[in-house]
């Protein structure tokens, strides 16, 4: 199966970046397989820490809380002289993305990102269900 990647660098002042995946056909979507972030600059004397999340909405969530139902993936990168590098990413596997996606820089630091995804074709009913699920999840 073919894979797609989105990658780039976000400045410390860039809070939200739109990632266009919507091609206008709601029966075409993507499943996020991996989301990685890492430092985009030299580590600070005390280390580097960054948090990011992928969301279906252009407004960043207040926290990295799993109750933010429009958020579908979380990632963190911590680099310091004591513990080396610690990284994690968590992805909600039930989401099929068939609309635009937004990457939120929750750490206020310069970061690189790489998002790996695979395409999926759905029936019209499945596509509508994903759109309805996205709207209902934000309540």
Where are these regions (language model features)?
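Beta-strand-centric surfaces of beta-sandwich/beta-rich domains
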Residues: 1-139
